[in-house]
Regions:
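Early exported N-terminus immediately downstream of N-terminal targeting peptides
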Residues: 26-81
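Bacterial N-terminal signal peptides that target proteins for export
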Residues: 1-8
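Sec/Tat signal peptide C-region and signal peptidase I cleavage site
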Residues: 18-26
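Bacterial N-terminal signal peptides
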Residues: 9-18
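An acidic, glycine-rich, mixed-charge low-complexity segment common to nucleic-acid enzymes
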Residues: 5, 49-51, 91
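A low-complexity, Ser/Thr/Gly/Pro-enriched, surface-exposed linker/loop concept
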Residues: 76-93
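Surface-exposed, polar helix/loop patches in the mature regions of secreted/periplasmic/lumenal proteins
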Residues: 88-148
Length: 149
């Protein structure tokens, strides 16, 4: 379990530290009840955007059923839209971490209500000092400690 946690931590750290690396694959639609799915749909195929979705083989390795991320370079309209979607989705969510600056969220970690008893859902969000937006959606048989330890 420690190896899985360590590997997952490295994967998440790589996403936040090197957001431009991986190529995008065709996106499968997120849960229909989440507004952040609109961010993936609206910006996923635009210039200066990297979208990542892990294959089933990778997901099983980490105890996940879905992993999807998007990185958007310096787009103020996308930032406003993403923050609006996050605000809508965080209602009813467990706020694990949230950092604001000048009235706007710059870093957030939410646990959303699950659709199935043993499947948890998480949203991670970060805006870098250079204006790079990173949004991550994770579903799986994980708890918040698995993602932060």
């Amino acid at each position: 379990m420690k190896q899985i946690r360590y590997t997952l931590l490295v994967l998440l750290a790589a996403l936040f530290l090197f957001p431009y690396g991986a190529g995008a694959t065709d996106a499968e639609v997120l849960q229909k009840d989440l507004k952040i799915q609109d961010v993936f749909q609206r910006y996923g195929r635009k210039k200066n955007v990297t979208m990542v979705e892990l294959s089933n083989e990778m997901l099983e390795t980490y105890g996940m059923t879905r992993y999807k991320s998007i990185t958007i370079k310096n787009d103020p309209d996308a930032l406003r839209f993403t923050r609006q979607c996050l605000e809508a989705d965080q209602k009813g969510a467990r706020k694990i971490k949230e950092v604001t600056d000048d009235g706007g969220v710059i870093s957030a970690y939410y646990q959303l209500p699950g659709k199935e008893a043993d499947i948890n859902r998480f949203v991670l969000f970060k805006v870098s000092s250079k204006g790079v937006i990173t949004l991550v959606y994770i579903e799986g048989d994980l708890d918040s400690d698995d993602l932060i330890t």
